């Protein structure tokens, strides 16, 4: 069985063709281009298998760091063979917020400023889909992304974070809803992990 591939680096496939796909591969061969150029190691290769509108399999590999996250729907999520999450919120004295190193928006900053917590807030800036994976492994509590991303930027890590017991949700006007894939417009809406 072979499935079609939707990729940042591939040809543009019209929605009229894509809307009939039951399964497809969603691939970003280089997520975190700015981090790659900066040579800081915070870039990833993202591969997801999408069923209708939901990631059911995901692999996020950071080659410079030699770190691999993966998940399969119903079978948990892992980081280098260790089941996620590795830590729980109760094991920390701070509320860790992860944000983009290269793409912080005013809206994201306002969201972070409005977070109400009894713990001291700690901001972690990192590139690529590693932000989502930090929430999956329990190294961060929340990742708000109120700025532009594409479906291939999130699909693989979305599978990982979902199987870790957390979730990636669409965020609009203070309300959360399911984040879907293979939409007519491949630009993601704002989301919070």
Give the positions of each predicted feature.
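Conserved beta-strand segments of alpha/beta enzyme cores
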Residues: 4, 121-122, 167
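Acidic beta-strand-loop-alpha-helix segment within the catalytic core
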Residues: 47-133, 183-193
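Flexible, acidic active-site loops/lids enriched in D/E/S/T/G that coordinate Mg2+ and/or position polar
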Residues: 1-51
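Conserved acidic residues
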Residues: 22-24, 56, 95, 141
